[in-house]
Amino acid sequence: MTSKSVKITDIIPQRKPFVFIDSLLGCDESSAETSYLIREDSIFTENGVFQTPGLIENIAQSAVAKIGYVSKFIEHGKVTVGYIGNVHHLIVNRNPEVGETIHTTVIFGENIAGIQLCEAVVRAGSEIIAQSSIKTAQDTSMPVDD
């Protein structure tokens, strides 16, 4: 996996306060890894705990970060708006707390008619705190303004 040093908002369509990854740690043809520091001021933090919808969005943004990186820096195209198509087999062992850094690994499966199938694992340290299958889609007719 190759390490990537890029500004996250250059490779995902989301903007603050709806950004739930801090860095793309690496990516290759079949996977991506991101990190995110859980913050008190996150819209998905409640009573010091990052809630499940935030974990889902973190997983989706982790998938889209790799897609955006390839689009912008390899294909020299634009980052486009993406959608969560389906979340399947979501298991949350625990929700992370403020101050913890989570690492999300996404393994890319088939891409069927523009629908990207992925498997994701979210860790805090060596502990698996969540995992899921997810489907995402990119709307190539809706590029994000730089």
Predicted features along the sequence, with ranges:
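Beta-strand-rich interaction surfaces with strong enrichment in secreted/lumenal proteins
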Residues: 9, 21-23, 47, 91-95
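Hydrophobic beta-strand-centered segment that forms part of the acyl-chain substrate-binding groove
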Residues: 67-103
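Short, conserved beta-turn/loop elements at beta-strand boundaries and strand-helix junctions
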Residues: 27-32, 64, 111-115
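Short aromatic-glycine motifs in intrinsically disordered, low-complexity regions
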Residues: 5-15, 79
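Catalytic strand-loop segment that frames the active site of acyl-thioester-processing enzymes
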Residues: 16-51
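HotDog/MaoC-like acyl-thioester-processing domains
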Residues: 97-103, 107-146
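Short Pro/Gly-enriched beta-strand edge/turn motifs at strand-loop
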Residues: 2-8, 100-104
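Active-site helix/loop of acyl-thioester processing domains in fatty-acid/polyketide metabolism
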Residues: 51-76
